[in-house]
Each structure stands twice: as C-alpha cells, then as structure tokens.
C-alpha cells in the first residue's frame, strides 16, 4: 500500500515512530515540548500555536482539572470540533493523568 500522506510530511519528520519508546502519550508530549518548543503545533485561521504554547496552555488547564478533585484515571469527555483547542484540551487531560473520552460534537439526541 502506498502511503501517499507521507509526501506531505515536512523534512526531518520520521515516517514511523517506535511506540515502545514512550510509556504513554503524555510522555511523548513532554518530549515534544522539550525538543520542539518553538516549532509549530497547529494553525487555524492564520493563528499559529507552537509546542511551547501548547505546553503552557495544557499545563494550566490540567492544573485546573486537578483542582476540581478528579481522581487519577478519571474519564474526561471532550466535545470539541477539529480546532486547536481540542489539542490543548486533550494534552491537558492526558498530562493531568486522566483518560480522554472523545465525543463527536455532531452527535444528536437520536
């Protein structure tokens, strides 16, 4: 199978990641914050966010969630469209030691 999406990867981005090198996605994020603080994480409507901003924002939100008294491993539902705030929220939940439950915002009652 041809992996055509690999053609859109910027130079230096590996095509494969060894999943055993990280204990969790949170650990992958922490390494990304250290290595790529000034590199772009996302862009939306010409507003760029780098990994340093992601670290700062997700850390603040994660601390807020912990301040609510949630127990480690608690499930946190995230109902957001595909916007940069989703990445911030997901990183915050994982870094705080919780489990992400992604909920499609297009779901209806029926």
Regions from the PLM with identified roles:
Residues 3-5, 27-50:
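AMP-dependent adenylate-forming
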Residues 103-105:
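Short beta->alpha connector loops at strand-helix junctions that form conserved
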Residues 97:
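Structured binding elements
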Residues 1, 24-32, 79-83:
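Short, functional N-terminal and low-complexity linear motifs
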Residues 1-22:
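Flexible, non-catalytic linker and terminal segments flanking ANL/adenylate-forming cores
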Residues 17-21, 38-83, 87-94, 108-110:
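Conserved AMP-binding/adenylate-forming core of the ANL superfamily
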């Amino acid at each position: 199978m041809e992996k055509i999406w690999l053609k859109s990867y910027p130079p230096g981005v590996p095509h494969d990641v060894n999943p055993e090198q990280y204990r969790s996605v949170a650990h992958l994020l922490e390494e990304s914050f250290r290595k790529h603080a000034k590199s772009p994480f996302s862009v939306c409507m010409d507003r760029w966010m780098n990994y340093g901003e992601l670290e700062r924002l997700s850390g603040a939100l994660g601390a807020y969630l912990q301040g609510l008294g949630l127990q480690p491993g608690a499930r946190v539902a995230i109902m957001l469209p595909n916007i940069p705030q989703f990445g911030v929220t997901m990183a915050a939940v994982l870094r705080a030691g919780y489990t992400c439950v992604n909920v499609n915002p297009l779901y209806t009652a029926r």
